[in-house]
């Protein structure tokens, strides 16, 4: 625990806002990729991935050096381990190969839809897929002149009748079953 406290004081003293060297390297990689805004948790996630990949490569290279009966891990062992894991290679598939796979997949017909499956659309003549209007250009079209509209202020006058309790009681009473609801 004392080591982390010393590390924090060293990094803050150097003006790195409490980030370690590894975190600063990840942040600089993000900035080089054009990512200016990111969640601070992204840095720790990328550091976790970096640690996992590095430890996997080193474990593999350690196994390779032990198999070759070497006392130390050499750069060749690390390079071989990285090649075996495929970490450092970024070989994207060829465009032609992807197009060929897509064409092969698209040549296969889709399975037939069962007759009783889902909702069916009505016949085309009953579907409103076509426009239902015809635009007629009017040659005598003239734009209207803008007129200024003046609004008279509408004054709400106080009601002349006051709501009485008997009016409220009449409104709350149930209607007879033979009453017409439209009236």
UniProtKB/Swiss-Prot annotation:
GO terms for molecular function: protein heterodimerization activity; transcription coactivator activity. Component of the TFIID basal transcription factor complex, composed of TATA-box-binding protein tbp-1, and a number of TBP-associated factors (TAFs). One of its GO terms (cellular component) is transcription factor TFIID complex. The keyword Metal-binding does not apply. GO terms for biological process: embryo development ending in birth or egg hatching; positive regulation of transcription by RNA polymerase II; regulation of mitotic cell cycle, embryonic; RNA polymerase II preinitiation complex assembly. The gene is taf-9. Belongs to the TAF9 family. The keyword Nuclease does not apply. This is Transcription initiation factor TFIID subunit 9. Keywords: Nucleus, Transcription, Transcription regulation. It is found in: Nucleus. The TFIID basal transcription factor complex plays a major role in the initiation of RNA polymerase II (Pol II)-dependent transcription. TFIID recognizes and binds promoters via its subunit tbp-1, a TATA-box-binding protein, and promotes assembly of the pre-initiation complex (PIC). The TFIID complex consists of tbp-1 and TBP-associated factors (TAFs), including taf-9. Essential for early embryonic development, but not required for transcription of some genes; probably acts via activating transcription initiation by RNA Pol II, as part of the TFIID complex. Disruption phenotype: RNAi-mediated knockdown causes arrested development at 90-100 cells and inhibits differentiation. The two E cell daughters (E2 cells), which form the endoderm, divide abnormally early, immediately after the MS2 cells. Phosphorylation of the RNA Pol II large subunit C-terminal domain (CTD) is reduced slightly in embryos. Abolishes expression of taf-10, perhaps as a result of altered protein stability. Reduces expression of a range of genes, including let-858, rps-5, hsp16.2, and pes-10, but has little or no effect on expression of cki-2 and sur-5. InterPro entries: Histone-fold (IPR009072), TFIID-31 (IPR003162), TFIID_subunit_9 (IPR051431).
């Amino acid at each position: 625990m004392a080591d982390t406290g010393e590390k924090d004081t060293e990094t803050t003293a150097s003006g790195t806002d409490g980030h370690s060297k590894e975190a600063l390297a990840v942040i600089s990689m993000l900035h080089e990729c054009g990512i200016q805004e990111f969640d601070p948790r992204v840095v720790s996630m990328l550091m976790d991935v970096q640690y996992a990949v590095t430890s996997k490569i080193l474990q593999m290279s350690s196994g390779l050096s032990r198999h070759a009966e070497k006392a130390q891990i050499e750069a060749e062992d690390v390079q071989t381990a990285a090649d075996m894991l495929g970490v450092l290679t970024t070989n994207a598939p060829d465009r032609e190969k992807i197009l060929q796979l897509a064409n092969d997949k698209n040549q296969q017909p889709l399975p037939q839809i069962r007759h009783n499956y889902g909702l069916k659309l009505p016949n085309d003549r009953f579907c409103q897929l076509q426009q239902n209007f015809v635009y007629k250009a009017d040659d005598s079209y003239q734009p209207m002149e803008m007129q200024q509209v003046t609004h008279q202020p509408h004054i709400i006058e106080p009601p002349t009748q006051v709501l009485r309790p008997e009016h409220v009681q009449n409104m709350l009473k149930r209607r007879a079953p033979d009453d017409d609801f439209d009236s």
